[in-house]
Amino acid sequence: SWNLRFITGTKKTRQKAGIILGTGKYIPKLIKIQITYKTESSTANIGQVINFVKLPFCELSLTGLIRFLPQKRILAFDFTYLKISVWGLTLYQGYIQNGVEREKLFAEKELKDQAFFKYFLIKDNFIAARGKGGGLALWTREK
């Protein structure tokens, strides 16, 4: 598992987000934004991703499929399932935006039609990537 520590957006994204994103944001340890990748040995390039945001009173998780292209260091992903909880009570849990169908077609989609990260730094305890839209994300390994 990896904890998100810093994010930026493209100039266009920053203009939309305004003061919230600015030129980039450090994510303090108080806010837990974690991403976990799971793969099976039989399908090493296809797997699952869980993106988890935890605040003192609420939790949000997005789950979906991933496809890793090792020669290009690209990880394509599609979040298809959402869970929202407040004070331990699940408010919503289910597929989003036709998620079941998108999961069936995920492996067949071209990279240009998917969201992805292109990793430019991969270390034992630190990873960094640019998103399809040009934003930057930095993660540290969960201890």
Can you describe what each PLM-predicted range is?
Residues S1-K143:
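Soluble ligand-binding/transfer domains with enclosed cavities or grooves
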